[in-house]
Amino acid sequence: MQNTIRIIGIDPGLRRTGWGVIDTLGNSLRFVASGTVTSDGDMDLASRLCQLHDGLADIVHGYKPDEAAVEQTFVNKDAVATLKLGQARGIAMLVPARAGLPVAEYAPNAVKKAVIGVGHGEKQQIHMMLKILMPKAEFKGNDAADALAIAICHAHNRGANRLRQAALAG
């Protein structure tokens, strides 16, 4: 008998970190909640990272997910922005890991492929597919929608990930 698995998807960002929580049972997906954790751009970097940490910790504590998935960082031409995003991503991975959750990572194109069928697509396509896959899904903005897409990507890939880990271990 299968158990429901609760997954939190996290789309890291220094200004806004999106989060989305879904329940999975077999191939079925159920929307639970989504939103964003924001940091105050007028504060110093360390304080902003603390805001992200505390906000995500509250979400993880409140929704009690079983597993987490975080989007990988892409490198752009602005090295400083990339480093700051990497620090926010570290928080996004640390919070669920400290709560004892396994944390998976997915490239942005893998997330898009899992949700819309191709690795390159527009935000509107993701929004549309989220509503098709989970008609009761509510999300305000791209960050929360992306986080739900990351959770769905993990739901589709978690079985393959477990098999891969078992093969490497044994």
Swiss-Prot record:
Pfam families registered for this protein in UniProt: RuvC
Cofactor dependence: Mg(2+)
Cell location: Cytoplasm
GO cellular component terms, A-Z: cytoplasm; Holliday junction resolvase complex
Binding site for Mg(2+) 2: 71
GO molecular function, one term: crossover junction DNA endonuclease activity
Catalyzed reactions: Endonucleolytic cleavage at a junction such as a reciprocal single-stranded crossover between two homologous DNA duplexes (Holliday junction)
SUPFAM superfamilies: Ribonuclease H-like (SSF53098)
Residues annotated as the enzyme's active site: 11, 71, 143
Annotated cofactor note: Binds 2 Mg(2+) ion per subunit.
InterPro entries (alphabetical): RNaseH-like_sf (IPR012337), RNaseH_sf (IPR036397), X-over_junc_endoDNase_Mg_BS (IPR020563), X-over_junc_endoDNase_RuvC (IPR002176)
Keyword Cytoplasm recorded: yes
Gene3D superfamilies for this protein: Ribonuclease H-like superfamily/Ribonuclease H
Assembly behavior: Homodimer which binds Holliday junction (HJ) DNA. The HJ becomes 2-fold symmetrical on binding to RuvC with unstacked arms; it has a different conformation from HJ DNA in complex with RuvA. In the full resolvosome a probable DNA-RuvA(4)-RuvB(12)-RuvC(2) complex forms which resolves the HJ.
NCBIfam families: ruvC
Protein's recorded name: Crossover junction endodeoxyribonuclease RuvC
